[in-house]
Amino acid sequence: MTDEGLSREIRKWDLVALLINVTVGAGIFRLPADVQKTVGNYSLVAFVVCAVTVGMIALCFAEVGSRFSDTGGPYLYARETFGPTSAFLVGWLMWLTRVAGFATLAQVFVAYLGYFWPPAESGLPRITIIAALVVLLTVVNIMGVKQSARVGDIFTVSKLIPLVLFVAVGLFFISPARFTLAARPGLGSFSAAVFILIYVFSGFEAVLVNSGEIRQPRRVIPFALIVALSASVVLFLLIQVVCIGTLPNLAGSERPLAEASQSFLGTAGPLIMSAGALVGIFGTLNVIMLACTRLPFAMAVQGQLPVQLARVHRRFRTPHVSILVSATAVLLLALSGTFIYAVKVTVITRVIVYASTCVALPILRRRNQTATPVRTVGKR
């Protein structure tokens, strides 16, 4: 148990699973077409540039994260480095982004469910399904972080099975002729493609909010970040290779993985990919609920929100008040359908969060010369 009253139940591989869950989200089922439409086969080069960029950001998070063991993640890093005002801004923006992200994915979930059961996309069935998602994940989170972590483990494996199947089978059906490079894209188009990829890979910072519930966070966080993001980059790159090599009209595809899989898995392909999308979205929703509900708790512990939000359930050792408040906000936004405007703030928020953590690194190094489990390139 931590000084905050929380229980450290997230193990090393639990954290890896949670990070993969939030990184390999619903975007992977549309990403190949979006990137291909922007830069054609140079999308593979964009992946390499993105991998290097995300890798540098992740290493900054790994080193900074190895210096903290309490709940808060980037919010806590900003508070320690820049003071309470900047931290409050980072914390609130992160919370709003996660709430909007959950609302968005809940809508995507019912859209994919509509592939199997069309009534799910509108009316009372839609409302019931979204409410059931929120209630179920709220109950799981209140019952204990151990339960949430185990759910994350199960859905990470379930999410990866169809994607690994897609790659493992699809690689045998690719046509080398489809990898011919056309005219080199302009800097603007290439930058846009890299931005799309970086945005899709983002989200890992949210899981670090739960540092107060991670076992040996100073050592586990760097390991989990490097393993999870490396695995995600390789998986995304291989999926792009299969899509390019098996789907002639990739740039114009609305459901690239489903259409590509049909060419080598037959009619079962789209069903497997759609089911995989449902599983993947649910897993991501679980991670978002786990992360966003801890931010108000962390801010309350630091005295920046009402103290009631810092209450911990006596039996389950979870921040139940913060969970209920966040879940209520998620439910209202998801049911209102107006979330689409709120989602636009996520890009700005992530730039602020990434920048604040990267800038915090050299400052924290100067203040504290203690050796850390991981160290990025640069002078102390």
Regions found by a protein language model. Give the residues of each.
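Select subsegments of transmembrane alpha-helices in polytopic membrane proteins
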Residues: 14-19, 98-101, 316-325, 376-380
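Membrane-interface "cap" regions at the ends of multi-pass membrane proteins
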Residues: 1-33, 37-42, 46, 55, ...
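C-terminal membrane-solvent junction of multi-pass transporters and transport-like membrane proteins
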Residues: 151, 184, 308-320, 354-380
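Hydrophobic transmembrane alpha-helices that form the core helical bundles
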Residues: 33-38, 46, 55-134, 138-142, ...
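TM-loop-TM module centered on a large, flexible mid-protein loop between adjacent transmembrane helices
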Residues: 76-77, 83, 114-120, 194, ...
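Juxtamembrane helix-boundary/capping and inter-helix hinge elements in multi-pass membrane proteins
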Residues: 38-41, 69-71, 80-86, 212-220, ...
